[in-house]
Amino acid sequence: MFLHSQDFATIVRSTPLISIDLIVENEFGEILLGKRINRPAQGYWFVPGGRVLKDEKLQTAFERLTEIELGIRLPLSVGKFYGIWQHFYEDNSMGGDFSTHYIVIAFLLKLQPNILKLPKSQHNAYCWLSRAKLINDDDVHYNCRAYFNNKTNDAIGLDNKDIICLMRQ
């Protein structure tokens, strides 16, 4: 269910949003990043993903988001659970008047780049970066770098050894 902008603004101002991030890895271990057009994280490199809609099952959200963000509809079984994360932004999709708080369910997808049909609706450019490069690149948003940096405390329900284990897989 998509909401009118005023209703959505009230929700973003008042409560966390639930989203799915798609950590897409190619055969060389590089991660797909898109340069964000929209707020929050506008102008930063970030993994694809998006919100879970009201009354939408996670499986359906995953399929919808892979189609919208990667250009190919994929079942949830393609993704490997990569933890639950918390993302905080000082702005929101409508402007800078209030912050945005996401609870993010992340999935790792190992895909061949040639099957992707990357759209330009959310990102104006794409690149593949190694984990080592993206961790040290300030143009990659902090919340995205956190997926590969075991020193952050942004994973919920995972301790550092679990994050390290996920990063090596």
UniProtKB/Swiss-Prot annotation:
Enzyme Commission no: 3.6.1.-
Motif (Nudix box): 50-71
Keyword Metal-binding on entry: yes
Transmembrane segments: none
InterPro entries documented for this protein: GDPMH, NUDIX_hydrolase-like_dom_sf, NUDIX_hydrolase_dom
Domain Nudix hydrolase: 13-152
Cofactor note (record): Binds 1 Mg(2+) ion per subunit.
Swiss-Prot/TrEMBL GO biological process terms: O antigen biosynthetic process
Binding, Mg(2+): 49, 69, 122
Gene3D superfamilies: Nucleoside Triphosphate Pyrophosphohydrolase
UniProt-recorded Gene Ontology molecular function terms: GDP-mannose mannosyl hydrolase activity; metal ion binding
Record site feature (Critical for catalysis), residues: 123
Residues given in the record as substrate binding sites: 2-3, 8, 36-38, 51, 64, 102
Cofactor(s) demanded: Mg(2+)
Cross-referenced SUPFAM superfamilies: Nudix
Keywords associated with the record: Hydrolase, Lipopolysaccharide biosynthesis, Magnesium, Metal-binding
Enzyme class: hydrolase
Catalytic reactions of this protein: GDP-alpha-D-mannose + H2O = D-mannose + GDP + H(+)
Pathway annotation: Bacterial outer membrane biogenesis; LPS O-antigen biosynthesis
Record function comment: It could participate in the regulation of cell wall biosynthesis by influencing the concentration of GDP-mannose or GDP-glucose in the cell. May be involved in the degradation of GDP-mannose and GDP-glucose, diverting the GDP to the synthesis of GDP-fucose as required.
Subunit note: Homodimer.
Homology family: Belongs to the Nudix hydrolase family.
PANTHER family to which the protein is assigned, alphabetical: GDP-MANNOSE MANNOSYL HYDROLASE (PTHR43046:SF12)
Name of the protein: GDP-mannose mannosyl hydrolase WbdQ/WbhG
Native organism taxonomy: Bacteria, Pseudomonadati, Pseudomonadota, Gammaproteobacteria, Enterobacterales
